[in-house]
Amino acid sequence: MFIFSLSYLKPISQVEKYLQAHIDYLECYYQSGHFIASGRKIPRTGGIIICRAESHEKAMSIIQQDPFYIHQIAQYELIEFVPSKYAKGFDNFI
């Protein structure tokens, strides 16, 4: 499992230009079962995506499809972890 931590490199006005394309990208990976949750950071300096992927390479290939990545709107920190304890029902996502 992976956490994608996005930090904006551009002003919000630039982020907004690519926001719909980013939302479409998110929806694609929710439909494929890769994305579990996502949302904005508070304050709005970037976002977080929780992703299920079989390898670091697959997670990177998913990141590289994001319009925010393609247009250098955000930088990404990729954090891999193994959930060892989780809430009831979360096992559906592991």
Describe the role of every protein-language-model region.
Residues 1-94:
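Conserved, structured core segments of small domains
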